[in-house]
């Protein structure tokens, strides 16, 4: 996506510099390319930030895979899947919005941005429901991990899975593997939920930042600031929003679909 022509200067604008064209740029094309380069550099720093979290996730899961299988039982895959669909829809409408800005479809741009903003609100609403449920059950980060009676019952049940029909008898079965003491298991689960809240919480903050940026672009679209030669802010916000969606596409299976 690029801007290939300069908008002619109208009588009410400064000579040689149309509205929204910064004075240190010679054309909308140059301004767009410079802005997009800066946006990509910013997105690389965001990727590096989340890469550190994904590395921490990989190390801890490699060392304690059983804790992730137990912890995943307390996550609602249906809510996570719904949020995934919502963000995928928002990426589609954001891409349509960028296209509408490129071809001077102001009404389409406004509608697409509004739908994208609505999808972001739905995502945060579902995430609030999830967090509220975890808070009620005491399934919080390390140091605050104090499971409620129902959660503790589920945790105890995970220690004694139902035997399969073809299992050997008690006389011939090998000795069971040693299980960590309850306090140690709770501590490990607390670390699991620390990872969960850190990764999903940081992602939620990025969603809120994206919603703020979309609101800013939406207000400017209503004020007729964008046209086929000047749509850079819409494109930049769209890139950011797509990255936020992509990060969630990785978070969802890694946290919710472990089993």
Describe the role of every protein-language-model region.
Residues 1-259:
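...captures the hydrophobic TM-helix bundle architecture rather than a specific catalytic motif
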């Amino acid at each position: 996506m690029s801007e290939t022509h300069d908008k002619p200067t109208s009588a009410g604008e400064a000579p040689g510099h149309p509205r929204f064209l910064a004075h240190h740029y010679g054309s909308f094309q140059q301004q767009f390319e410079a802005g997009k380069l800066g946006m990509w550099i910013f997105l690389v720093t965001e990727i590096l930030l989340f890469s550190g979290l994904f590395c921490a996730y990989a190390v801890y899961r490699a060392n304690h895979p059983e804790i992730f299988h137990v912890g995943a039982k307390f996550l609602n895959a249906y809510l996570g899947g719904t949020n995934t669909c919502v963000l995928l829809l928002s990426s589609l409408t954001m891409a349509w919005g960028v296209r509408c800005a490129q071809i001077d479809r102001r009404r389409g741009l406004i509608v697409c941005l509004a739908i994208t903003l609505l999808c972001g609100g739905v995502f945060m609403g579902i995430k609030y429901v999830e967090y509220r449920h975890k808070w009620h059950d005491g399934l919080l980060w390390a140091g605050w991990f104090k499971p409620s009676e129902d959660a503790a019952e589920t945790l105890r049940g995970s220690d004694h899975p139902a035997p399969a029909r073809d299992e050997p008898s008690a006389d011939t079965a090998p000795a069971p593997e040693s299980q960590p003491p309850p306090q140690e298991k709770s501590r490990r689960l607390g670390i699991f939920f620390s990872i969960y809240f850190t990764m999903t919480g940081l992602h939620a903050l990025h969603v809120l930042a994206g919603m703020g940026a979309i609101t800013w672009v939406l207000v400017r679209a209503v004020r007729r600031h964008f046209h086929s030669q000047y749509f850079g802010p819409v494109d930049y916000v769209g890139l950011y929003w797509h990255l936020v969606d992509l990060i969630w596409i990785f978070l969802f299976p890694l946290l919710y679909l472990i089993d």
